[in-house]
Regions:
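Pro/Ala/Gly-rich low-complexity, hydrophilic intrinsically disordered segments
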Residues: 90-97, 107-148
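Conserved beta-propeller blade repeats
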Residues: 121-127, 166-184
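Short beta-strand->alpha-helix linker/helix-N-cap micro-motif
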Residues: 1-49, 60-66
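Surface loop/turn motifs at the tips and blade-to-blade linkers of beta-strand repeat domains
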Residues: 100, 162-167
Length: 194
């Protein structure tokens, strides 16, 4: 759970986004918040026995603090419930946790990054939540269909049209650097990049 402190509640709920990401991965069983015996937002509030009772193996939690007009500080911790300690520790044996300072429109990106940290820590495989997908839609016009190449967050949010054409397009593919897209087109040019 992520505890919010402030006057201006952001549109994006980090807990919901992280939960949805991890659920969609098919690798995690998530507990609904109404089954939590406690709701920590800081390490000193964690009572491991509460989480062991309901058979939780890992606990992700943090805070979202409003520190200015549309400015938020997000703090994220991940703990191993059965070992009774933070997942990440420094050489000095102190907990390593993550902190971001962002505007409200960047909270969804932070939630995707948190999801990636959790996924990697618990599975050993890098997460792909803070990535984008590309897809093509076809809209039926009054005379001819319109094809559109769209880029969106991995969960489908923040979709943006990057190309609209009356000629058919298909097979969008990311360049290895992840910054460019290639596609097959059936117009004047056989292929394109954007």
């Amino acid at each position: 759970p992520f505890h919010f402190q402030g006057q201006q509640r952001p549109n994006e709920e980090i807990t919901e986004i992280v939960s949805a990401n991890l659920y969609r991965s098919g690798r995690f069983n998530l507990f609904p918040p109404d089954q939590f015996l406690s709701h920590p937002s800081e390490t000193k509030q964690v009572r491991y026995k509460d989480w062991r009772l309901i058979k939780v193996e890992a606990l992700a939690f943090g805070r979202v603090d409003q520190i200015g007009d549309d400015l938020f500080e997000v703090t994220f911790h991940l703990h191993d419930v059965y070992k009774g300690r933070p997942v990440w520790k420094g050489s000095d044996n102190k907990e390593i946790f993550y902190r971001w300072t962002v505007t409200g429109d960047k909270l969804r990106k932070v939630a995707h990054q948190i999801s990636d940290y959790i996924y990697k820590a618990l599975t050993g495989t890098p997460g792909a939540f803070d990535t984008q997908i590309a897809y093509i839609t076809v809209r039926q016009g009054s005379v001819t269909p319109q094809f559109e190449l769209i880029v969106a967050d991995s969960d489908g949010h923040n979709d943006q049209s990057v190309l609209q054409t009356l000629s058919p397009i298909l097979s969008p593919a990311w360049a290895p650097d992840g910054k460019r897209l290639a596609y097959v087109g059936f117009g004047d040019d056989d292929t394109g990049a954007t």
